[in-house]
């Protein structure tokens, strides 16, 4: 018999922010994690779109962040958005292709006290020269070819 679980009163959303040194739109072996980046977590009611929760967080060492979310936000749509990078040489917020400036998700599958989300990345101004080798290993063409 299924026993209904009590609503979660608080939990953590955690993830990482990285510098996309190859401007690939995903983590590569040359990516570097960014301490000191800021992000915003915002949840909205799925019925009327009203904002129900907003929190700003900052990355620590290894680009890790963890934000405490108060109360249950089941059946709401939430989004984590990049605000600013901790690195001047890697602060371009991606807007097209595979890379996105934000990550959208629903909080209806929270089990326990932590929810880990996919990493978000800032683009380096220009790709590192070694990136051609990375793309070659992956069997891909570098962007802008």
Swiss-Prot record:
Impact reported for residue 107 to A: Loss of IgG binding
Outcome after substituting residue 139 to D: In strain: cv. Rowghani; variant 2
Record annotation: effect of changing residue 29 to A: Loss of IgG binding
Name under which the protein is recorded: Major pollen allergen Ole e 1
Further details from the record: Replacement of several other amino acids by Ala has little or no effect on IgG binding.
Effect recorded for residue 106 to M: In strain: cv. Bella de Espana; variants 1, 2 and 3 and cv. Rowghani; variant 4. In Ole e I.3
Outcome of substituting residue 55 to A: Loss of IgG binding
Recorded consequence of changing residue 106 to L: In strain: cv. Zard; variant 2
Variant or mutagenesis effect after changing residue 115 to C: In strain: cv. Zard; variant 2
Maturation and modification: N-glycosylated; contains high mannose (Man(7)-GlcNAc) and partially fucosylated complex glycans (GlcNAc-Man(3)-Xyl-GlcNAc). Complex glycans may contribute to the antigenicity. Exists both in a glycosylated and in a non-glycosylated form. Ole e 1 and Ole e 1.0103 are the only non-glycosylated isoallergens. A second potential glycosylation site exists at position 50 in cv. Bella de Espana and cv. Hojiblanca.
Resulting phenotype, residue 14 to I: In strain: cv. Bella de Espana; variants 1 and 2, cv. Loaime, cv. Lucio, cv. Menara; variants 1 and 2, cv. Picholine marocaine and cv. Picual; variant 1
Disulphide bond pairs: 19-90, 22-131, 43-78
Effect annotated for changing residue 15 to Q: In strain: cv. Arbequina; variants 1 and 2 and cv. Bella de Espana; variant 3
Effect of mutating residue 133 to A: 50% loss of IgG binding and 40% loss if IgE binding
Substitution effect: residue 112 to A: Loss of IgG binding
Consequence of changing residue 46 to G: In strain: cv. Bella de Espana; variants 1, 2 and 3, cv. Hojiblanca and cv. Rowghani; variant 4. In Ole e I.3 and Ole e I.4
Outcome recorded upon mutating residue 38 to G: In strain: cv. Bella de Espana; variants 1, 2 and 3, cv. Hojiblanca and cv. Zard; variant 2. In Ole e I.4
Recorded consequence of changing residue 138 to A: 70% loss of IgG binding and 90% loss if IgE binding
Effect in UniProt of substituting residue 21 to Y: In strain: cv. Acebuche
Effect of residue 95 to I: In strain: cv. Rowghani; variant 3 and cv. Zard; variant 2. In Ole e 1.0105
Record annotation: effect of changing residue 86 to S: In strain: cv. Bella de Espana; variants 1, 2 and 3, cv. Rowghani; variant 4 and cv. Zard; variant 2. In Ole e I.3 and Ole e I.4
């Amino acid at each position: 018999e299924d026993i209904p679980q009590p609503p979660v009163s608080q939990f953590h959303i955690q993830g990482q922010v990285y510098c996309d040194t190859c401007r690939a739109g995903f983590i590569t072996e040359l990516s570097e994690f960014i301490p000191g980046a800021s992000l915003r977590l915002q949840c909205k009611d799925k019925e009327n779109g009203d904002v129900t929760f907003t929190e700003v967080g900052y990355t620590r060492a290894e680009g890790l962040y963890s934000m405490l979310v108060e109360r249950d936000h089941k059946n709401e749509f939430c989004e984590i958005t990049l605000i600013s990078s901790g690195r001047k040489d890697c602060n371009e917020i991606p807007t097209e292709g595979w890379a996105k400036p934000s990550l959208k998700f629903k909080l209806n599958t929270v089990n326990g006290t932590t929810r880990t989300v996919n990493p978000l990345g800032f683009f380096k101004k220009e790709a590192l020269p070694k990136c051609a080798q990375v793309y070659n290993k992956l069997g891909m063409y570098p962007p802008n070819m």
